Amino acid sequence: MIRVAHSRKVQLDEIDRAILRLLQEDGRMSYSEISRRINVPESTVRARVNRLIREGVIRKFAALINPFKAGYEIVAFIAIDAEPAKVRQVVEELAKLPEVDVLGIVTGAHDIFMQVTVRDLQELERFILEKMAKIDGIRSTETSILTSVKKWGYARVF
């Protein structure tokens, strides 16, 4: 499981941030192109990217896919109330499910919040009534379906 909230913070300077911004624009951008754009040696870019990977700032390089264009009609946000002693256990089980895109323990009215992507309403129903129902410790859920997208981004680098 990815531990985000309590991870050790990595010091980023302006060169690191510039590299990260460019890679977020185009993850396939070559080190030589990044080097040219930010006016530092290619060896510096290569060393910085390797350090950012090693320190966990860059988790992986992947395509950012539009789920709707790829045949997934439903993006849903599910708030979960769990038995207090089983919150972590519930999260560990939910993390194993391929439909789950984002998952975390939260503050506020619920214990756990997640984003799931499925092909249609029937698949969402099966996910909730069959897969989630098997997980011990879930007391209740509240599901909201995304009806339109105004912005779909990723972690910003300040």
Curated annotation (Swiss-Prot):
Keywords: DNA-binding, Transcription, Transcription regulation
One Gene Ontology term from the biological process aspect of the record: response to amino acid
Pfam families: AsnC_trans_reg (PF01037), HTH_24 (PF13412)
Chain residues forming the annotated DNA-binding region: 31-50
CDD domains noted in UniProt: HTH_ARSR
InterPro entries: ArsR-like_HTH (IPR011991), AsnC-type_HTH_dom (IPR000485), Dimeric_a/b-barrel (IPR011008), Tscrpt_reg_AsnC-like (IPR019888), Tscrpt_reg_AsnC/Lrp_C (IPR019887), WH-like_DNA-bd_sf (IPR036388), WH_DNA-bd_sf (IPR036390)
Recorded GO CC terms: cytosol
HTH asnC-type domain segment(s): 12-73
GO molecular function annotations of the record: sequence-specific DNA binding
Hydrolase as UniProt keyword: no
PANTHER family: LEUCINE-RESPONSIVE REGULATORY PROTEIN, TRANSCRIPTIONAL REGULATOR AZLB
Name of this protein: Uncharacterized HTH-type transcriptional regulator PYRAB01370
Organism: Pyrococcus abyssi (strain GE5 / Orsay)
Lineage, uppermost ranks: Archaea, Methanobacteriati, Methanobacteriota, Thermococci, Thermococcales
